[in-house]
Amino acid sequence: MSSKLRLGVAGPVGSGKTALVEALCLRLRDQLQLAVVTNDIYTQEDAQFLTRAGALEPERIRGVETGGCPHTAIREDCSINRAAVADLEGQFPDLDLVMVESGGDNLAASFSPELVDLCIYVIDVAAGDKIPRKGGPGITRSDLLVINKIDLAPLVGADLSVMEADTRRMRGERPWCFTNLQNGDGLVQVVEFVLQQLPNA
């Protein structure tokens, strides 16, 4: 039996993907049956981080070592991730949500529709306020764009109003939000988005 929703979480290295997955697990685990697949190039660092953080029981977390280019494992040949998801769905037949966190990649990374139903794309303010206008599938076509680390804006000279204007121009009506996952600012919008996507929500 498959889970009700498979959610991809993608974005550049250090943008806050694992922090978002952890926050979603902690917020949703008491009301939903959850599991996570993480992707790293040569390690299982993100899976180990989630386990140490107590985000979920260890058996609900699978770490995939992609080798080479991380985008290949979520797009062109996602068989290793599909197998990990299928394994979790076999072990936990009542899963509501499986999150698949990609390895850190560039703005062109996107998930295969064979792997996930929806994608959240995470960027961070520390990379500069020009990132939204650079475009790419994650910026323009993700189901939800999360602009993380807003607390760093004054430290890196990023203008959040510029980021907001560029994001609205690049995304049109597609949803997006600002977050600071260190203190939970904006997390409620991400949680509400996820809950709204579940069947029979």
Swiss-Prot record:
Q: Say yes or no: keyword Chaperone present.
A: yes
The residues listed in the UniProt record as binding GTP, with positions renumbered to this chain, are G11, P12, V13, G14, S15, G16, K17, T18
Q: Which GO cellular component terms are attached?
A: cytoplasm
Q: What UniProt keywords apply to this chain's record, in alphabetical order?
A: Chaperone, Cytoplasm, GTP-binding, Nickel insertion, Nucleotide-binding
CDD domains, sorted: UreG
| InterPro entries for the chain | CobW/HypB/UreG_nucleotide-bd, P-loop_NTPase, UreG
Tell me yes or no: is Transmembrane helix among this UniProt entry's keywords.
no
Annotated localization: Cytoplasm
Gene Ontology terms: biological process = urea catabolic process
Question: Which molecular-function annotation in GO is an example for this chain?
Answer: GTPase activity
> What domain of life?
Bacteria
> Gene3D superfamilies given for it?
P-loop containing nucleotide triphosphate hydrolases (3.40.50.300)
What start and end residues bound the annotated signal peptide? Answer: none
Its family remark reads: Belongs to the SIMIBI class G3E GTPase family. UreG subfamily.
Protein purpose? Facilitates the functional incorporation of the urease nickel metallocenter. This process requires GTP hydrolysis, probably effectuated by UreG.
Q: How does it assemble?
A: Homodimer. UreD, UreF and UreG form a complex that acts as a GTP-hydrolysis-dependent molecular chaperone, activating the urease apoprotein by helping to assemble the nickel containing metallocenter of UreC. The UreE protein probably delivers the nickel.
Q: What is this protein called?
A: Urease accessory protein UreG
